[in-house]
């Protein structure tokens, strides 16, 4: 029997409708361009956009090394790809403007809750199992994602939230799963993890010793989950078949 359960975020509890990610990206570029102009720092919009694109690719490379950078580190990364000296030219007001421009667009163009996400978390909570979240953060950092989860009514079910930008570790790092296990003082074999990504979620959690349930039909790429479900409302049955819950 398991003593705790953990969830991935994107593709598991929330997802983006078509075009929302692009709208979010364009808003980020526009807000950054406008914030820089307010500070008397005039850059071509195309240069700002190009800087974000290259910085996003660099962030992916950082994640590939199973590490991450802080929320402020994201802003620095993006700004340096616009102008290497730009971060050194900002005062406190400038940092506030740019942090907001870079980090918060998801509050305006929000993701959508996965079907049955709230009901699934509520059902697990009734069992008395602690629920954790382990998520890699992209351009949107953990503190913004918590605000979104709170607005969706999901945060109240989560007893621990581990975001990559806050621990500076990224899935599939074994260490980020161990960090989450420590939150509940449970052994890997006493916990299950639910996620959609074959490498980040399935391989990562299995390598850390957790029971693994994959949601969705993304190819396993050699990483085999203990169980697979199409929708969250199938999770209880999957856990019972694995004899992890009564």
Task: Name these PLM-found stretches.
Residues 2-122, 126-127:
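N-terminal helical cap/lid subdomain that shapes the substrate entry/recognition surface
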């Amino acid at each position: 029997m398991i003593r705790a359960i953990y969830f991935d975020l994107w593709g598991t509890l929330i997802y983006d409708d078509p075009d929302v990610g692009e709208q979010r990206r364009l808003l980020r570029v526009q807000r950054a361009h406008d914030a820089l102009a307010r500070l008397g720092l005039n850059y071509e919009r195309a240069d700002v956009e190009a800087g974000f694109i290259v910085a996003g690719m660099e962030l992916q490379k950082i994640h590939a090394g199973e590490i991450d950078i802080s929320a402020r580190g994201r802003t620095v990364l993006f700004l340096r790809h616009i102008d290497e000296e730009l971060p050194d030219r900002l005062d406190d007001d400038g940092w506030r403007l740019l942090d907001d421009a870079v980090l918060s667009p998801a509050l305006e163009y929000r993701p959508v809750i996965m079907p049955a996400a709230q009901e699934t978390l509520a059902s697990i909570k009734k069992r008395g199992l602690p629920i954790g979240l382990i998520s890699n953060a992209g351009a949107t950092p953990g503190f913004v994602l918590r605000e979104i989860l709170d607005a969706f009514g999901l945060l109240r079910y989560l007893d621990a939230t581990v975001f990559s930008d806050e621990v500076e570790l990224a899935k599939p790092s074994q260490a980020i799963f161990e960090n989450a296990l420590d939150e509940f003082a449970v052994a890997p074999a006493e916990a299950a993890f639910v996620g959609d990504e074959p490498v980040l979620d399935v391989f990562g959690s299995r390598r850390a010793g957790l029971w693994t349930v994959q949601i969705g039909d993304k190819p396993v790429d050699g990483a085999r989950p203990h169980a697979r479900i199409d929708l969250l409302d199938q999770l209880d049955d999957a856990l019972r078949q694995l004899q992890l819950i009564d």
